[in-house]
């Protein structure tokens, strides 16, 4: 067991002070939580600095914080931002560690069994271990997570009970320490020294913690006593410093002991006998034979090796839980007085709600056809009510909060003023009759002013037809759709900003990374067709694309004003009025955001000259030779590794996609 530090303070480091609506929002949110509020909504318009407000609230409350985002990319962006704001505290990243994951499944119509197949990202596994160990060691922890945080993770009590605490002067036999390391799933390897392994050289034991990728621990013995503990560079062996105490956490989150394993095996055998009787009673002899064969094989593996493939399906037995009881998750590693923040809650909360049902439907099929025992259903994500039971204090953050948030709390704090003084755009509704000719006139006006245009349509065909029509008129236009690869997509956005073309057409321009300050006009065609792409929230998010430019305008082409349109227009007008009044009172003139235009493939800071950011020349794939492409792959691979080391996962992922596309070009 280890004692948790509870007296650390969050130290917010930022080159600017709160501005606009931020000071009032920070004060209100903090005071409400301190007064006992359990749930609040931060309704922050695009570009108002919601992350900075969240950081200030974390600093004021000084509690361990879990921030949940709806995808890995956004979680990576938030992680990087919070790392900058809190360089002296533990900011951790917890997302699914699978690069590739094919879940186990059975398709009865074609009698096809699909084996589970996965590829684990070692870097993310390290970060997950870092997150859980930080939560047990200290109180000044921020964990940025994806929805994977509601999936089973193992019992935190077992994890904590297996922590090895070592100090110089402590009496312990070297061989006893080696046995303890094996018990907590460390592997001995005297040659290939990496995460989760240890090696032995005489009276010296070197341990590579699962939460590190560069520093190892060297434990030096004198007889049966620990003489010295030093932290060393895992690659060079150079001593970094002496340690008076170290806590070595298990190499896996799924810890158990021999007694629990024996009990679990007996429990699995009992369930198997019960299930076989049911299947045979229903005349399902093939299913019964299949289940008996598969389960007995798994039991043999567990008895001999302490492990089997797909052991997570027996997690209920391993953790001694009752049927239907919720699994342990990352949320159980947080102390009771923690705070939760849900980023883009209008998307994230429906995701959390939907995880359980999707998982159950797939598993039920495996159980019905004799591939798994019914207890496999208890290896699952949390249900929404179970998730809510873990909530102490929660803050929903969104530009367009959903109905769930409204049900949970009536406390909504608005953040509408942008520190830049920029206003929400003007909105005009125009008739569908003659919409294209009207739009062409507006496009030409913007081209004369060297500004850009977004057009969003409802169908792929309409996008393609409109693109062809505008090209015939001599307008420089591109079409952005889901088939476009990552590299090409970032280059299209960059070319739009550079003015290589003036109009970008797409179906759903809400995706991250399409914030282009040069865009002064957003045209929404068929705005009165109710549906997902024309809902109130989608319209507000799309309207927000024009809020980065001082001349921002939105045209809604529609023959009638739907409820969604009315609400979106009213909300935008309300925000704009508040922003105008604030600017007048404080004598602020809105200025378009100046955002540097980087190459689609840009050099990460070089190791030799970290102060320099080197840009590659524009890449012309069509005219590059094979040798040049191979050289480019090598250079980009180096940049990708460097970006991952600097924890810039968004950049690393972009570079990875670029490398894959270059390789496919070469092949």
From Swiss-Prot:
Annotated Helicase C-terminal domain residues: 435-597
Keyword terms: ATP-binding, Cytoplasm, DNA damage, DNA excision, DNA repair, Excision nuclease, Nucleotide-binding, SOS response
Localization in the cell: Cytoplasm
Annotated motif Beta-hairpin, positions: 97-120
One annotated GO biological process: nucleotide-excision repair
Record domain UVR: where: 630-665
Residues reported in the UniProt entry to bind ATP: 44-51
The Helicase ATP-binding domain, residue ranges: 31-414
One of the record's GO molecular function terms: ATP hydrolysis activity
Any GO CC annotation of this UniProt entry: excinuclease repair complex
Keyword Cytoplasm: yes
InterPro entries in the record: Helicase/UvrB_N, Helicase_ATP-bd, Helicase_C-like, P-loop_NTPase, UVR_dom, UVR_dom_sf, UvrB, UvrB_inter
Domain notes: The beta-hairpin motif is involved in DNA binding.
HAMAP family with a match to the protein in the record: UvrB
Record family assignment: Belongs to the UvrB family.
Function text: The UvrABC repair system catalyzes the recognition and processing of DNA lesions. A damage recognition complex composed of 2 UvrA and 2 UvrB subunits scans DNA for abnormalities. Upon binding of the UvrA(2)B(2) complex to a putative damaged site, the DNA wraps around one UvrB monomer. DNA wrap is dependent on ATP binding by UvrB and probably causes local melting of the DNA helix, facilitating insertion of UvrB beta-hairpin between the DNA strands. Then UvrB probes one DNA strand for the presence of a lesion.
Quaternary state and interactors: Forms a heterotetramer with UvrA during the search for lesions. Interacts with UvrC in an incision complex.
Name of the protein in question: UvrABC system protein B
Lineage summary: Bacteria, Bacillati, Bacillota, Bacilli, Lactobacillales
């Amino acid at each position: 067991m280890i004692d948790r530090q509870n007296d650390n303070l969050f130290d917010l480091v930022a080159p600017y002070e709160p501005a606009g609506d931020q000071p009032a929002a920070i004060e209100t949110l903090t005071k409400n939580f301190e007064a006992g509020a359990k749930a609040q909504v931060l309704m922050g318009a695009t570009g108002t600095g919601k992350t900075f407000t969240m950081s200030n609230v974390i600093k004021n409350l000084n509690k361990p914080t879990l921030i949940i985002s709806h995808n890995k990319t956004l979680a990576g962006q938030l992680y990087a931002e919070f790392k900058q704001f809190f360089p002296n505290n533990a900011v951790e990243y917890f997302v699914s560690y699978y690069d590739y994951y094919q879940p186990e499944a059975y398709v009865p119509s074609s009698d096809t069994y699909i084996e589970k197949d996965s590829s684990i990202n070692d870097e993310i596994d390290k970060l997950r271990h870092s997150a859980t160990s930080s939560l047990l060691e200290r109180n000044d922890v921020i964990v940025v997570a994806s929805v994977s945080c509601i999936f089973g993770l193992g019992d935190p009590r077992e994890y904590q009970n297996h922590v090895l605490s070592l100090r110089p002067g402590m009496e312990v036999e070297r061989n006893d320490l080696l046995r303890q390391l094996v018990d907590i799933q460390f592997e001995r390897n005297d040659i290939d020294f990496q995460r989760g392994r240890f090696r032995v050289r005489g009276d010296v034991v070197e341990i590579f913690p699962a939460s590190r990728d560069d520093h190892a621990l060297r434990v030096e013995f004198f007889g049966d006593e620990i003489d010295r503990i030093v932290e060393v560079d895992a690659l060079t062996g150079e001593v970094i410093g002496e340690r008076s105490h170290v806590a070595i956490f298990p190499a896996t989150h799924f810890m158990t002991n021999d007694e629990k394993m024996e009990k679990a095996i007996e429990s699995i055998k009992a369930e198997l006998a019960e299930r076989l009787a049911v299947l045979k009673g229903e005349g399902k002899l093939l299913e019964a034979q299949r289940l008996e064969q598969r389960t007995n094989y798994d039991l043999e593996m567990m008895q001999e090796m302490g492990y089997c493939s797909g052991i997570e399906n027996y997690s209920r037995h391993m953790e001694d839980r009752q049927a239907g009881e919720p699994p342990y998750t990352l949320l159980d590693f947080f102390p009771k007085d923690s705070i939760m923040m849900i980023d883009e809650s209008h998307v994230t909360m429906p995701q959390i709600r939907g995880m359980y049902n999707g998982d159950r439907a797939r598993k039920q099929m495996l159980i019905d056809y004799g591939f798994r025992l019914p207890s496999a259903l208890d290896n699952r994500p949390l249900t929404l009510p179970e998730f809510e039971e873990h909530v102490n204090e929660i803050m929903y953050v969104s530009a367009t909060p959903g109905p769930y948030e409204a049900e949970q709390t009536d406390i909504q704090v608005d953040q509408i003023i942008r520190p830049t003084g920029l206003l929400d755009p003007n909105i005009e509704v125009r008739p569908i009759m003659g919409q294209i000719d009207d739009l062409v006139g507006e496009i030409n006006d913007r081209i004369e002013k060297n500004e850009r245009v977004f057009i969003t349509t409802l169908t792929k065909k309409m996008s393609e037809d409109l693109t062809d029509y505008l090209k015939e008129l001599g307008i420089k236009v591109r079409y952005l759709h889901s088939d476009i690869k990552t590299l090409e997509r970032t280059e299209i956005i960059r070319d739009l900003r550079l003015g290589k073309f003036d109009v970008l057409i797409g179906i759903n321009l809400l995706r991250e990374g399409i914030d282009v300050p040069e865009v002064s006009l957003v045209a929404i065609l068929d705005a009165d067709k109710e549906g997902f792409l024309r809902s109130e929230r989608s319209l507000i998010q799309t309207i927000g694309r024009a809020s980065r430019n001082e001349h921002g305008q939105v045209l809604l082409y529609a023959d009638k004003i739907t409820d969604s349109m009315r609400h979106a227009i009213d909300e935008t007008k309300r925000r704009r009025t508040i922003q105008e009044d604030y600017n007048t009172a404080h004598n602020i003139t809105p200025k378009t955001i100046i955002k540097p235009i980087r190459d689609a493939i840009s050099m990460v800071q070089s190791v030799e000259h970290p102060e320099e950011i080197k840009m590659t020349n524009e890449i012309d794939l069509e005219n590059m030779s094979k040798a040049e492409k191979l050289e480019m792959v090598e250079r980009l691979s180096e940049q990708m590794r460097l970006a991952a080391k600097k924890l810039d996962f968004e950049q690393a992922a972009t570079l990875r996609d670029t490398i894959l596309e270059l390789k496919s070009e070469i092949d």
